[in-house]
Design a protein with these regions (language model features):
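Glycine/proline-centered hinge or cleavage motifs at structural transition points of membrane proteins
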Residues: 7, 66-67, 80
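C-terminal transmembrane helix and the adjacent membrane-cytosol boundary/short C-terminal tail
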Residues: 49-53, 57, 64, 91, ...
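Membrane-embedded alpha-helices of multi-pass transport/permease systems
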Residues: 31, 38-60, 87, 91, ...
Length: 176
């Protein structure tokens, strides 16, 4: 929970120092991805814990009571029952990543291009929509900046809508 309260710019500085300098990755898409992974890990961990807590203890005790192994109970009872909450947390974390700029500015660089082939350019600096928005505002290109902002807003709202839809769909299928 403490990690969730850390500002994203601090994660960006950590990613720049640790991944960029200490590991020698420099400004690259890989450095940005690793930093974002560490940044959203607390969110995914917390939502997964909450989803696992919502599974009734009677499911666990019932499976173990009829002789199921602990691993079989986790794989066939616990995880499928908690999957709606886990997926919702992952989708919300993706929504947070899409709108992130501070951590990426320090780790992935501020290139003016989006990579055409992700795997051949993974160790090079690249651009994202949030960084493009920042760069357009710096150059007083307000029409382009507002266009990028609208695209970002639609993407984030779409991801949040998808999370709500998936959560509702799984709850309906589960009979909740």
């Amino acid at each position: 929970e403490t990690l969730s309260g850390i500002p994203s710019i601090i994660f960006g500085l950590f990613g720049m120092v640790f991944f960029g300098n200490a590991l020698g990755l420099g400004y690259s898409i890989l450095t940005g991805a690793l930093t974002l992974t560490i940044m959203i890990l607390p969110l995914i961990t917390r939502t997964t814990q909450e989803a696992l807590k919502t599974v009734p203890d009677s499911y666990r005790h019932g499976a173990l009571g009829i002789g199921a192994t602990k691993w079989y109970m986790i794989r066939t009872i616990l995880l499928p029952s908690a999957m709606p909450g886990i997926l919702t947390g992952v989708i919300l974390a993706i929504g947070r990543i899409v709108g992130e700029s501070a951590a990426l500015l320090f780790t992935a660089g501020s290139g003016y291009y989006l990579p055409k082939n992700l795997f051949s350019k993974i160790f090079e600096s690249g651009g994202t929509l949030t960084i493009q928005l920042y760069l357009f505002m710096q150059k007083a290109k307000y029409n382009e900046a507002f266009g990028v902002a609208v695209v970002l807003l639609v993407i984030v709202l779409g991801i949040n809508g998808l999370a709500k839809y998936m959560s509702h769909r799984f709850n309906v299928e589960a009979g909740a």
